[in-house]
Structures are given as C-alpha cells and as structure tokens.
C-alpha cells in the first residue's frame, strides 16, 4: 500500500467518524436541557430536602 493510499484511507476514517458523531451530538442536546436548567434535580432538592445527585446525596436523602 502506497503513502497516498494510506493517507486517503486515513482521511476516509476521520471524515466518517466526524459525520457519524454529528447526529449523536445534536440528539443529546435536547436530552440535556433539564441538566442545563436551573430547576434541575439539585436545585429542587434544596427546597424540599431531597437529592438524588451524587454531589448532594451525602447531605440529603434521595427519597426514592
């Protein structure tokens, strides 16, 4: 295999990986809206004393 063929194969793999990763990135944006929102699980837990997030779980009960 020549250098030109190996470089072409490398570019093909890089471009394929980039194209495949775009749809998964845009699909996850909608699912992360709650995590980006101020009224997420950690924010609500401060008002009612419950938290299921590992960062505040040692200070509050999960309530599940």
Curated annotation (Swiss-Prot):
GO annotation, cellular component aspect: extracellular region; host cell postsynaptic membrane
- InterPro entries of this UniProt entry? Conotoxin_a-typ, Conotoxin_a-typ_CS
The places in or outside the cell where this protein is found are:
Secreted
In this chain, the stretch annotated as Disordered covers 23-46
Claim: Signal is one of the keywords in the record: yes
- Which residues carry the post-translational modification Cysteine amide, per the record? 62
Disulfide pairs here are 51-56, 52-62
Q: In which tissues is it expressed?
A: Expressed by the venom duct.
Q: Where is the signal peptide?
A: 1-21
By sequence similarity, the record places it as follows: Belongs to the conotoxin A superfamily.
- What is written about domains in the entry's comments? The cysteine framework is I (CC-C-C). Alpha3/5 pattern.
* Reported function: Alpha-conotoxins act on postsynaptic membranes, they bind to the nicotinic acetylcholine receptors (nAChR) and thus inhibit them.
- What's the protein here called? Alpha-conotoxin-like Ac1.1b
């Amino acid at each position: 295999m020549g250098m030109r063929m190996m470089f072409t194969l490398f570019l093909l793999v890089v471009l394929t990986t980039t194209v495949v990763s775009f749809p998964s990135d845009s699909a996850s944006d909608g699912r992360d809206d709650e995590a980006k929102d101020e009224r997420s699980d950690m924010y609500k837990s401060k008002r009612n004393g419950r938290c299921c997030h590992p960062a505040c779980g040692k200070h509050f009960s999960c309530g599940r």
